[in-house]
From Swiss-Prot:
Subcellular localization: Host cytoplasm; Host mitochondrion; Host nucleus
Family: Belongs to the pneumovirus non-structural protein 1 family.
Upper lineage: Viruses, Riboviria, Orthornavirae, Negarnaviricota, Haploviricotina
GO cellular component: host cell mitochondrion; host cell nucleus
Motif (DLNP): 136-139
Subunit structure: Monomer. Homomultimer. Heteromultimer with NS2. Interacts with the matrix protein M. Interacts with host ELOC and CUL2; this interaction allows NS1 to form an active E3 ligase with ELOC and CUL2. Interacts with host IRF3; this interaction leads to the disrupted association of IRF3 with CREBBP and thus reduced binding of IRF3 to the IFN-beta promoter. Interacts with host MAVS; this interaction prevents MAVS binding to RIGI and inhibits signaling pathway leading to interferon production. Interacts with host MAP1B/microtubule-associated protein 1B.
Notes concerning its domains: N-terminus is important for IKBKE/IKK-epsilon reduction. The DNLP motif has IFN suppressive functions like binding to host MAP1B.
Origin: domain of life: Viruses
The organism of origin for this protein: Human respiratory syncytial virus B (strain B1)
Keywords: Host cytoplasm, Host mitochondrion, Host nucleus, Host-virus interaction, Inhibition of host adaptive immune response by virus, Inhibition of host innate immune response by virus, Inhibition of host interferon signaling pathway by virus, Inhibition of host IRF3 by virus, Inhibition of host IRF7 by virus, Inhibition of host MAVS by virus, Inhibition of host RIG-I by virus, Inhibition of host RLR pathway by virus, Inhibition of host STAT2 by virus, Inhibition of host TBK1 by virus, Inhibition of host TLR pathway by virus, Interferon antiviral system evasion, Modulation of host cell apoptosis by virus, Viral immunoevasion
Pfam families: Pneumo_NS1
Disulphide-bridged cysteine pairs: none
Gene Ontology biological process: symbiont-mediated perturbation of host apoptosis; symbiont-mediated suppression of host adaptive immune response; symbiont-mediated suppression of host cytoplasmic pattern recognition receptor signaling pathway via inhibition of IRF3 activity; symbiont-mediated suppression of host cytoplasmic pattern recognition receptor signaling pathway via inhibition of IRF7 activity; symbiont-mediated suppression of host cytoplasmic pattern recognition receptor signaling pathway via inhibition of MAVS activity; symbiont-mediated suppression of host cytoplasmic pattern recognition receptor signaling pathway via inhibition of RIG-I activity; symbiont-mediated suppression of host cytoplasmic pattern recognition receptor signaling pathway via inhibition of TBK1 activity; symbiont-mediated suppression of host JAK-STAT cascade via inhibition of STAT2 activity
Protein name per the record: Non-structural protein 1
Length: 139
């Protein structure tokens, strides 16, 4: 029982912004409750925003199935409980090493978790998320 397995979950991202780019988002973590984590991601809403030429991704999960510290034993991301409906926005993710010479996204692209953004950049980012979701995140 208590044995945790290393699991990689892949989520295909299509139509990033206004083009036909396709990428594969890879989420790797140690968990002993992979079914719950998979279900949470299957029901997640994924939004992308381009900021200063970098593509950032928010994976938004329902509060009912959102992984917490009891599910995600070891990972490179945290949850940010800022949605008014009680859901969670997962930490910023930056796609790297994804561009091919033909301009399309590489299916084998890597992800890295972003460093903390400056307050001004974060404010700009959150305003874009707020507009995208129709939420007032400042209230």
């Amino acid at each position: 029982m208590g044995c945790n397995s290393l699991s990689m979950i892949k989520v295909r991202l299509q139509n990033l912004f206004d083009n036909d780019e396709v990428a594969l988002l890879k989420i790797t973590c140690y968990t002993d409750k992979l079914i719950l984590l998979t279900n949470a991601l299957a029901k997640a809403a994924i939004h992308t925003i381009k900021l200063n030429g970098i593509v950032f991704i928010h994976v938004i999960t329902s509060s009912e199935v959102c992984p917490d510290n009891n599910i995600v034993v070891k990972s490179n991301f945290t949850t940010m409980p800022i949605l008014q409906n009680g859901g969670y926005i997962w930490e910023l993710i930056e796609l790297t090493h994804c561009s091919q010479l033909n301009g399309l996204m590489d299916d084998n692209c890597e992800i890295k978790f972003s460093k903390r953004l400056s307050d001004s950049v974060m404010t700009n980012y959150m305003n874009q998320i707020s507009d995208l979701l129709g939420l007032d995140l400042n209230s």
